[in-house]
Amino acid sequence: MLSVGNDIVENERIRELLQKHGDRFLKRVFTDDEVEYCHKHKDPVPFLAGRFACKEAVIKALNLEPGQVADMREIELAGTNFGKKTLVIHGKTEKFFREKGFTGSSVSISHADHYSTAVVVFFKEPK
């Protein structure tokens, strides 16, 4: 069985949230490792936007209601620029993932001038 979620984020929206809320926004949405990774780039905004889109895509793939994910930091994307991205799910969100019987995931993130997008696929390994 597969479950797919996708999301698209306007990069400027993330830039505005950063300007308005600064570290408070970062600490509420991203893990320390995600923030560190994104800030290694000349412009961290597209990378933050891609990770934000990934988190939203996870929520859609799990078919969760907005209030069911208490902490966006429970959804973490680890990986390098061109290497494989690894989705790490913690806490309550991981519980939903396991309860639905999923055993693995695949993630793809893309950036364009004004938008970042993510697609997440959850799957169950055949027995």
From Swiss-Prot:
What Gene3D superfamilies does the entry give? 4'-phosphopantetheinyl transferase domain
This protein is called Holo-[acyl-carrier-protein] synthase
Mention one GO biological process in which this protein takes part, according to its record.
fatty acid biosynthetic process
The yes or no answer to whether the keyword Transferase is present is yes
Principal localization?
cytoplasm
Keywords of the record? Cytoplasm, Fatty acid biosynthesis, Fatty acid metabolism, Lipid biosynthesis, Lipid metabolism, Magnesium, Metal-binding, Transferase
Q: Where does Mg(2+) bind?
A: 7, 56
List required co-factors: Mg(2+)
Short name of any one Pfam family annotated for the protein: ACPS
